[in-house]
Swiss-Prot record:
Keyword match Transmembrane helix: no
Record protein name field: Putative ribosomal RNA large subunit methyltransferase H
Keyword presence, Methyltransferase: yes
Pfam families: SPOUT_MTase
Native organism: Methanococcus maripaludis (strain C6 / ATCC BAA-1332)
Family matches, as HAMAP family: 23SrRNA_methyltr_H (MF_00658)
Amino acid sequence: MNITIISVGKIKEKYLSGAIIEYSKRISRYSKLDIIEVADEKTPENPSDVEKSKLLEKEAERILKYLKKDSFVITLEILGKELTSESLAKKINDLSISGKSDITFIIGGSLGLSRNISEISDFKLSFSKMTFPHQLMRVILLEQIYRSFRIINGEPYHK
């Protein structure tokens, strides 16, 4: 299994970096993991819809450079499908069994994802109807991927 996380923006807080390093280590027992950070665009105060669209398209261009053609793409979106941890584990396991051993998760920046990225998504995943900082979402996603592998392998952790 190969998992790639493409995320817009850099992690600046040490406590988040520490959690990312820890979960990356834990996941490495089960899967190859690549985390790719693409630069985010500086967002002006109160941007217009046109400005937002232009910023999102610039970020999308950066994301697309790293997207592999054969990868199953999962975007994190507020309007995506909410899953339980067990359902996410089943999704990852089912993809692996069906021969889709390369999964790419995409986390947008503060403005979200461009429509172009959303349209190429094979699965839109939502962690909540609430909005979270995109840097924190990386930690939450890594924790859920790790939890998924523990569930798939029947190992204790997910209770």
